[in-house]
Amino acid sequence: MLTGQVRAPYVPLGNPRIDRRHAHSVALAAFFRDAKENGGQDWKTAGDFFLRAPGSRDAPCERVGGFLTPVPSEVTGALLAILPAPALARLGIADGTWKAELCALLDQVRAELTHDVAVFEERRREAFEARRSDLAARFERSINTLTRRPLLGFLANRNILPKYGFPVDTVELRTAHCDSQVGSRLELSRDLSVAIHEYAPGSELVAGGVLWRSAGIYRLPGRELITRSYTVCRGCQHYREGSQDLEPACTACGRPADGPVREYCVPEFGFVADPRTGKPGSVPPQRSWNGAVHVVSLGTELAETRWQAPTGALAWCHSGTRGRLVSLAEGPGGSGFLICDWCGWGGPNHGRAPRSHVNPLRGKPCTGPLRWRSLAHTYETDILRLRLDAPGLDTRAQWHTVLYALLEGAAEGLEISRGDIGGVVHAGADGSSGLVLFDTVPGGAGSVLRIASTLDQAVAAALRRVGACDCGLETSCYGCLRTPGNERHHEDLSRSAALTVLESLSGLRLAARA
């Protein structure tokens, strides 16, 4: 950057989440303008827009569907002008079907806010009847915090409107009900793939000078969390999931299923903090990053690119969009979390289930059933499957070494943020091992598609990085292969294994494209 050699900013136009949220912004802008000009109505806060006023049959957000039926011509015209052609067909702009998801999102957010306000109002009333005026005042302030949030920022944080940066599936750790007054002023939001670790039941974090502890996941009345069974083959590490019983044998290698069949849930409504807060101390907050990313499906219509090196080594790239991934958080020791089906209370596995627990949001005893579950974030993104015919790829440790060498090389050589790309060693349906690289951005940012078309540059940069490091050949360090995210594989990563493969791939040339 200092010498003036830096890649120009790159923004893909085909990210469906960016496209959809811009469509939402056009529709809501037209709705707000119509309400102001024809009805003199103006909503500044979340409560104004999402809650029903006394004596009113509906909330303003519930009128959006009627305004968009049929979709006004000026809205359709604006969408046709600003969205790329592939997005028009994918979202259903021409026939107006795109509006259904907007209305569904608005209804979900309305239900969440209505439920939260009702819970705090109930607790405020109980405190008042118990002559706890201080506690009643705190719950009143919590209600004000929820209802007086600026509307546009609230819509962006709820994944309805676009915001700066690539879209993510954000969830919140709710703190307004806690005993610290700081909780009513905080908005602790994270990308769901990060939140399943940082906000998982039992995890701790420091914010606003207060130590918070997650007490469970947020349950919305009338809405059930998505759950699925899954297992990982102990032989080839092939991942399988389903809503019903899984096949008794691995579909990739045929090995009889000997790994545990677990269940995950997607905490899409967020998390709830323990009402009792603490003070930060000298001991770091407790947190567990035990888990992994798995490939559920590679998507469809993969474009193939074949590369060949002077040594005879070959590389096949199959790249495309809409690959489906699942990021799992399996708790300390990989034993999962105990979660209540009714109130969402949760905790890590400490050997036995507690005899009783308290609803973390309402503060009342709950007798709901408890289940052992993992936490998950599922999403679609751009994906690249890479098959290699090169020496030195006989073990999974060697595959992991090459994986992280290529990711670091692609980040340096193609000027891609390392946090925007990830990868796994993947056992395909035929049992063969390979690498899967993916964009960490839901919907895809086009990064791995660039890697597929410039694999030679990524390999060259990886070779320079690994070859120039000063650590021992039989080991690795944070200057070549190691990152905090691949800590579980640190002992398997070695520079010599990476150099063996990368040197055989040096000088790659494009052989065929399909």
Residue positions per predicted region:
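Conserved segment of the helicase C-terminal RecA-like domain
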Residues: 1-9
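Short peripheral tails and domain-boundary helices/loops at the edges of structured domains
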Residues: 220-248
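Extended, highly charged accessory segments
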Residues: 9-12, 16-209, 215-218, 246-514
